[in-house]
Amino acid sequence: MIKIQPEEISSVIRKQIEQYNQEVKVVNIGTVLQVGDGIARIYGLAKVMAGELLEFEDGTIGIALNLESNNVGAVMMGEGLTIQEGSSVKATGKIAQIPVGEAYVGRVVNALARPIDGKGEIPTSEYRLLESPAPGIISRRSVYEPLQTGLVAIDAMIPIGRGQRELIIGDRQTGKTAVATDTILNQKGQNVICVYVAIGQKASSVAQVVNTLEERGAMEYTIVVAENANAPATLQYLAPYTGATLAEYFMYKGRHTLVIYDDLSKQAQAYREMSLLLRRPPGREAYPGDVFYLHSRLLERAAKLSTALGEGSMTALPVVETQAGDVSAYIPTNVISITDGQIFLSADLFNAGLRPAINVGISVSRVGSAAQVKAMKQVAGKLKLELAQFAELEAFSQFASDLDKATQNQLARGRRLRELLKQAQAAPLSVEEQVSTIYTGINGYLDSIEVEDVRKFLAGLRGFIAKSYPKVYEIVRTTKTFTTEAEDLLKEAINEYKKNFSATAA
């Protein structure tokens, strides 16, 4: 039997007394009064901040949104199925923040920036607030660099610049996501980090986009943030801010970023659901009064930063879905007024076989030619004018039976120019290819080609120039201008290819 010496006991007690730390910890704790539908009402959180993160007993995280006189209304970032009336809630003293870093590139994450692609954890050490203030006036400079989408109709007539916010708007199934994903594919080799935010979409649709990006090697510079249709409204509401925060990390490091929010109608619906459950007074179309601020504070974070801040940029392409082409509904008008222009996709044009179904007449870019390279400016001006005149004449020609020769010629050219704007999905064109394509159309080289052969002719011509007259593309690519030398070579190439094409067609 071991004998314990009294001195040993006393030394152990003395040591314990010396190590005793009389630290007082103050924790702000409340009690759940009511819970359900992703909303909790809590009593007793006296010193909670608006937007502060709360921790429930089962580990679920919530955000305090409604601070009322006798209770706090919080939304939960999870199911919260085990939370009961009377269970305790702890205020964390933190505002919502997410980890950020280079390691996120090529990954698929949720609104809390946690990986959902099964490729393991993402190593990061930096954090950024989910709701950061937008850069001020002095922190910005005007948009002057082009962001090429690879789509002729957009790059020629509705150009987008780095740091711009351009809305993509249209009915369901008109190719809005296709325009956005084509823009991502076209950023390959341009040193642009792309963030694709999928809000409230079918998991199958998101998987399809991710597969397309992986197949084309675009995931190497892309981050996908996804909250599917079955996700809690809180997470669908937060997803766009997560995308903006991840892009901001790169923007403030002097990099160029492109963020696509697909789509903000779903985010507004999720926010409406949260607000109505929190018993906030409904406004127009039952949306809460601050739904404009919901989108403005998100889109104002897109900017072209000043030289002092490293000249980084964040370009935002928000997507909004309309019902039966009604652009005067609440959310579409809100987002149109916040953005620097809109690309309107028409269901009628889509069904008529014009894809991408861009309605050039009511689409606009408020940055304009400042976001175009000189070569594109040289050829694009005439294209827009010819198409506008064609649209007017086409409407008139439906009523007139006998048209003069000049009008018939103009209509014939207009039909060929419209063919020129058609493009297959996931087949973006480089600037030099676009310039040569538009030049061919506006200078009458397509007038003798049958309308149904125009696309085949142009595809063959682009390949022929790349193979036999590569200097044309090289001049435009390096000088960014369409010089007389390039023009002479291009004329020669078109005439030579046209002879061969006519011979094979015959």
UniProtKB/Swiss-Prot annotation:
GO terms for molecular function: ADP binding; ATP binding; proton-transporting ATP synthase activity, rotational mechanism. Pfam families: ATP-synt_ab, ATP-synt_ab_C, ATP-synt_ab_N. It is found in: Plastid, Chloroplast thylakoid membrane. It catalyses: ATP + H2O + 4 H(+)(in) = ADP + phosphate + 5 H(+)(out). Keywords: ATP synthesis, ATP-binding, CF(1), Chloroplast, Hydrogen ion transport, Ion transport, Membrane, Nucleotide-binding, Plastid, Thylakoid, Translocase, Transport. ATP binds at residues 170-177. Its EC number is 7.1.2.2. It is a peripheral membrane protein. InterPro entries: ATP_synth_asu-like_sf (IPR023366), ATP_synth_asu_C (IPR000793), ATP_synth_asu_C_sf (IPR038376), ATP_synth_F1_a_nt-bd_dom (IPR033732), ATP_synth_F1_asu (IPR005294), ATPase_a/bsu_AS (IPR020003), ATPase_F1/V1/A1_a/bsu_N (IPR004100), ATPase_F1/V1/A1_a/bsu_N_sf (IPR036121). One of its GO terms (cellular component) is chloroplast thylakoid membrane. The record marks 363 as: Required for activity. Produces ATP from ADP in the presence of a proton gradient across the membrane. The alpha chain is a regulatory subunit. F-type ATPases have 2 components, CF(1) - the catalytic core - and CF(0) - the membrane proton channel. CF(1) has five subunits: alpha(3), beta(3), gamma(1), delta(1), epsilon(1). CF(0) has four main subunits: a, b, b' and c. Belongs to the ATPase alpha/beta chains family. This is ATP synthase subunit alpha, chloroplastic. The gene is atpA.
